[in-house]
Amino acid sequence: MNIQALLSDKVSQALIAAGAPADCEAQVRQSAKAQFGDYQANGVMAVAKKLGMQPRQLAERVVELLDLTGIASKIEIAGPGFINIFLDRQWVAEKVEYALTAPKLGVAPVEPQTIVVDYSAPNVAKQMHVGHLRSTIIGDAAVRTLAFLGHNVIRANHVGDWGTQFGMLIAYLEKMQNENASDMGLSDLELFYQQAKKTYDEDEEFALRARAYVVKLQSGDEYCRQMWRKLVDITMAQNQVAYDRLNVTLTKDDVMGESLYNAMLPEIVADLKAKGLAVESEGATVVYLDEYKNKDGEPMGVIIQKKDGGYLYTTTDIACAKYRYETLGADRILYYIDSRQHQHLMQAWTIVRKAGYVPESVPLEHHMFGMMLGKDGKPFKTRSGGTVKLSDLLDEAVERAGKLIAEKNPDMPADELKQVINAVGIGAVKYADLSKSRTTDYIFDWDNMLALDGNTAPYMQYAYTRVVSVFRRAGVDETSLTLPLVITEDREAALATRLLQFEEIITTVAREGTPHVMCSYLYDVAGLFSSFYEHCQILNAESEEIRQSRLKLAMLTAKTLKQGLDTLGIQTVERM
């Protein structure tokens, strides 16, 4: 249930009845402080200005016309014309009852869209490193959130699986008489890549053969295609290990690499020329964009085909957007790519729109993100200044979590201990990233992310175990809670109202691609439950009705924390 949407609709109706235009905005928000009610409507001032009225006078008229019977216990006008709405506790109690038994915590079904989400995008013949972490886990949180709401989500792993490097790798594998590349681990391939590059730079005959293999590969030579396929398969098998460890939903079926669009590139260049968008310039094919200026203030030229006939990333990205709309039937396309690629994407999409490949009604959204930094504020590196491999980072996370958890649980069975350690270690790395606004850089700090207090995965996972332990101690389950829910205390009301705001939060996350909003919400819920737990007797409540009511609040808290963390890809545990 989306209380904000319900109240917005009611306040808008009252505003229109009071003389406001039909497109007026009620601007209903969750109140920042309890003294201002549960929700506040802030749209009166802007409407009053348009109507030439005193804001307070309009607010009084709106309140007269506002029908919140059974929903609000009190409506107040504050300051120059804010309308404060206090929810009726009986109404809140009924909605909690509904959320407890309804599918998806009572979140209303959406009109399903086909949404393509582009994320992760590692390179073939390279190990994944920390630079892939943000795209992978933020993108996956978006995918999980959209799927929870009922959208048809297409995961698109835009793997770097094409280019001149493949001629070099195929030639080097042949040189080493090791065509059976599938027997090699990716670490060997990484070494092969370095050795192949060194040989390519130093041996002209080898370089000629490598370049010849590029041409053969691009023209569909069977031997080269087989070798290329092996390189891709080995890489993706190793990446799948990382995805599984990260509890990320990507599989080999989601790979849509650069090579997928190869056949489209000549057609796109020809079409852009035919439409008068692309022209020849010094042998290359260029699209000049008035929207972007070069340093001389002239329209910027974007090359889509080099004079040697080769294509560029921009050409591939144009084809990619076209394919996602025309072939996949996308209603919305999201790209989780770092902020440094913003201008490149904007230029490609400007061409896409001008060419009519994707209509304006289909959003192309760059959900950009900042960098992961070390404590020194510089890009996160190894002590020797090298790139941190993702597998090494996850190994260290589990090792550090192991020390933390094993210390506190000396009697936990080995299998359960291993599962808890893994959930906490991997969860800590993911949550530390997801809990920060994606648009900013963030500092990677082991001590902060593994802390058992503050907005961290270990704290949230512990908060969940604390709630479910109530039911273990009580020896009850949901089916035994048969009495109606009543709310008698302020702390009960605060927790119940916040729990009912889950739909507002998940809708915001889906619209804006901002998982940190979910993290902040879950942290709030955990804090409100903690206060409720400390001040309101649950198992020893003064009556059976209040005992069951408080157990129901605890039950919805557990379900909300678990579901919210699941949309982030964070695993919960029953004990910690």
UniProtKB/Swiss-Prot annotation:
Catalyzed reactions: tRNA(Arg) + L-arginine + ATP = L-arginyl-tRNA(Arg) + AMP + diphosphate
Keywords carried by this UniProt record: Aminoacyl-tRNA synthetase, ATP-binding, Cytoplasm, Ligase, Nucleotide-binding, Protein biosynthesis
Gene Ontology CC annotations of this record: cytoplasm
Enzyme Commission number(s): 6.1.1.19
Placement of sequence motif 'HIGH' region: 122-132
Protein's name according to its UniProt entry: Arginine--tRNA ligase
Gene of this entry: argS
RNA-binding recorded as keyword: no
